[in-house]
Amino acid sequence: EINFALSNSQGGENYGWNIFEGKHCYPEDSNCENSGFIEPIFEYPNDANYVRILLGLKQKNPNMDGCSITGGYIYRGTNIPSLYGRYIFGDYCTGKVWSINIDDDIENLDIIDHTQDILKGIGKKEFYLSSFGQDNNGEIFLVDYNGAIYNLAIKN
């Protein structure tokens, strides 16, 4: 799941932990109430077969799959202008990397799969994402399972 707080937030938002997993009761058979909780702006299930029915989200790429969202950063660098202001995140199990617009219109999320372009940009055929980093200039780094660090680069 991806949670979002406005920049003027005072903090202390309640995203439902440990009663919810995304927008769903946890454990599933519990009778949970969501009053006072802030729902995530995006989620996908561990079982990718259900992503197409996920709460009516409009996605550019309906083939999202994975097991665990690996959080990233809002891109503030200058090397890839098309990503400026977008939240970059990935999946721990598949190595896929997406970006999502983060603005006031969280009802109409624009989700873009950058995986193939990133693989070309870092010169690899596959990549397994374990973490992200960001430098003082807003450029983003990708860390793989083996500890190698790559500059975020996109080649079309």
What role is predicted for each listed range?
Residues 69-70, 106-136:
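Conserved blade-ending motifs and adjacent loop-strand segments that build the rim/top face
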Residues 130-156:
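Blade-level signature of beta-propeller repeat domains, shared across WD40, Kelch, NHL, RCC1
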Residues 1-112:
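Beta-propeller domain segments
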